[in-house]
Amino acid sequence: MSNAKSLEQLEQTQDFIRRHIGPSPAQVSDMLSALEVSSVEELIGQTVPAGIRLEQPLTVGESRTEVETLSYLKSVASKNKVFKSYIGQGYHPTHVPHVILRNVLENPGWYTAYTPYQPEIAQGRLESLLNFQTMTLDLTGLDLASASLLDESTAAAEAMGLAKRVSKAKKANAFFIADDVHTQTIDVVSTRAEQFGFEIIVGKAADAVNHEIFGALFQYPSTTGEVVDITDLIAGVQSKKAIACVAADIMSLLLLKAPGKLGADVVLGSAQRFGVPMGYGGPHAAFFATRDAYKRSLPGRIIGVSKDRLGNDALRMAMQTREQHIRRDKANSNICTAQVLLANMAAFYAVYHGPQGLKTIAQRIHRFADILAAGLQAKGVSLKHNTWFDTLTVVSDSKADVIARALASGVNFATNRDGEYSIALSETTTRADVAQLFDIVLGEGHGLSVDAIAADIENNGSTSIPASLERDDEVLTHPNFNSYHSETEMLRYIKRLENKDLALNHSMISLGSCTMKLNATAEMIPITWPEFSNLHPFCPLDQAQGYQIMMGELHDWLVNITGYDAVSLQPNSGAQGEYAGLIAIRKYHESRGDAHRNVCLIPSSAHGTNPASAQMASMKIVVVDCDKNGNVDMADLKAKAEAVAENLSCIMITYPSTHGVYEETIREICDVIHQHGGQVYMDGANMNAQVGVTSPGFIGSDVSHLNLHKTFCIPHGGGGPGVGPIGVKSHLAPFMPNHSIINVPGTNEGNGAVSAAPYGSASILPISWAYITMMGSEGLKQATEMAIVNANYLTHELSKHFPILYRGRNNRVAHECIVDLRPLKELSGITEMDVAKRLQDYGFHSPTMSFPVAGTLMIEPTESESKVEIDRFIEAMVSIKSEIDKVISGEWSIENNPLVFAPHTQGDVLGNEWDRAYDRFYAAFPVPSVAKNKFWPTVTRIDDVYGDRNLVCACPPVETYRD
């Protein structure tokens, strides 16, 4: 057999590469022929400037099979020790209902969707997020809630920012934090305050009123477990015209009076213990609520109820003009990616258990705390407080002995305070656990009976929650929280919502700058392993050796891929990565006596988070012009760099550019900035066009953030989670984020944290680790090359029908292109919005609309899409062009055509009335391929103006279900 395959070929060691990369060799050949090149290498040579091509290949190892990868990672995970965690401090063990685990967390219909900017094809997760907001409003007792923030600590930092914006104490520049707030929250808020130039005052809660402040933060219950009435504290803060913020435990709010009812202006916290694993720190969804009067200052996305074209209720993201991509340096926050997938899990947890089920869980946790307290006090153990919900703090001279017994028993307590330790109970606590806790604290032979103590408490009651703070109002009364308590009903509810949403498991999502590539199943499997999901972020490091190995390997690979010298994995979104990178630059300048360097140059084409992040780092922004080809105007750059040379801090630049081209002058740009004493911050949003071909460090950049949820395959989750690690050159490494509880090696001791957990959203890092492992050095390079091939083929075909706005050398684009719809709009009146909505009828999510240029679509196919799917998208765009031509010719009027009526629902096309200039079948099935896999939007076009003018951000009242 002369043509027999080699053993190496039969072993299929590189099989994952062909699974990840969409086009087959034959399809690649066809695309190259269309581009009139003979090889991928020839196309790359025409596209990527020779001067920035890597001289050496990546060294992240050879590709491994899926089986090998998971087997090795399982052996690494086994080095983690999963102790019973009673550490608390914002992180608690929880039971993830299996119906949610399997059908949401492990379901690509939920985890591969994008942020719901196209609401007509996102009504499912929008409803779930509205449930999350309704849950937040009910439990906090406030008027308005957002659809999740990154974690409790960053939510507290956002609360400080809101307080400064809305407080009438305009001369005050100090923010007060009670000393019984979680340590990590004090850390993160202090980091944010340092950049804003705010003073942080940490002290006894009662002292807040003694300071000139614009806001204050209290913990409810306190980090050591005390439950106190904070009504007077809140009133005292408000008497200073300051804003009273409360970080609350979400489970406790089933039993405790809502902070809003106590007078709080802002209530925030983590929804983690509502069915989301601890995951060594994340990801978790934070909740955030405030008064209606402050709605324009609310950070994060807000889901609101509006009307569609037919007058039906429909959901959308409300008040989007507040967001960073529009407001830029004037935005309330730089937050972009939030925690939608985790918010949905928490919302489904509340839906599944309902108000009575949640209250029962909270009562059980509290009862066990009462039992534990009664037993310990009966034996003379001194408790720090007389009130509690779930956490007891023991004051002890024998702390070391108790902790030693705990560790020997596979148990963790909170030990980060001198002379005391805390025991935080959770949903997972059992009678046997309480008996074990007696043994650990008291030693053997104590003679206590859990059952006997429980009976005594049942007979005599408990005073550990003051009567004045007992919750007496009903919560979660909406039907969504009272209808789906059997698994059958819950399963169908989840499926019903999933069916309303278009995700990657249905079709290509070609959002430019978003890199919606394959999130392989093998990459996702490890995140639910208990060895990764059940660790507390503050557990002793010797219990997290598996994590340290995995994160260490990922760190080294990212260093190699980026050409930097060190990486921080702490930032839990790209925006947080930008913020952390800019802080590193500021601290570097300060260390050299150059604290005055505070000017950030930003090209006019920059992503909206860039100016928003720069203003968060208190930098002065100077905008650099772009030329007619979309490149940085070098003359303008040089002039402005020279003009601000004494105060130049950095430039923020994206590469390839946000316009989708490899700018030839990128190294010259870096040189200009360095010559004037500045640093180069390269936005990693387009790293998918660099890996293995070039790198930020090789080009000359000093720091970048990476979007692991773009280039490195963490799914977008419908709007989060994300991970935004930063890579830096050696001179910036000491200035990366540290942490107040778990020291991060290689960083200066005084560096603050930017995320609540030392390693951010650690439990999803195995996704990127697995992607790199299975692709290997060669596979990663092939992925970049194929992203470039797909983008150029798509551009070539679309250019026959639409103008392409920007191109680079040899008329090539990088990994995305911008289709200019403005000429067609002038001729026809058809807008980019009309095109985006009509694409839904063809089964596609719209590309990025009106960014970075108004009136355009930015399209990024990624390497994971086959030529078949790309051709299907091209067919849709060409068909839409023919529809626009009919409007231009007068065959269809601007008022009566399928574009302005798009999208079309089943109810629309099957309705009794039809007065359109086109037939019903064409409305829904404009090309034959649509019929093979038809996706039906569930609402017609949504009225954005109505939604903002009539803001409703909670589930509609029961009456609407009767209509």
UniProtKB/Swiss-Prot annotation:
N6-(pyridoxal phosphate)lysine modification, residue list: 710
CDD domains the UniProt entry points to: GDC-P
GO cellular component: cytosol; glycine cleavage complex
InterPro entries noted in UniProt: EF_Hand_1_Ca_BS, GcvP, GDC-P_C, GDC-P_N, GDC_P, PyrdxlP-dep_Trfase, PyrdxlP-dep_Trfase_major, PyrdxlP-dep_Trfase_small
Keywords of this entry: Oxidoreductase, Pyridoxal phosphate
Enzyme's top EC category: oxidoreductase
Pfam families associated with the record: GcvP2_C, GDC-P
Molecular function (Gene Ontology), one example: glycine binding
Keyword Oxidoreductase included in the entry's annotation: yes
Keyword Cell membrane: no
Domain of life, per lineage: Bacteria
GO biological process terms held by the UniProt record: glycine decarboxylation via glycine cleavage system
HAMAP family, A to Z: GcvP (MF_00711)
Subunit structure: The glycine cleavage system is composed of four proteins: P, T, L and H.
Alphabetical list of NCBIfam families matching this protein: gcvP, PRK04366.1
Official protein name in the record: Glycine dehydrogenase (decarboxylating)
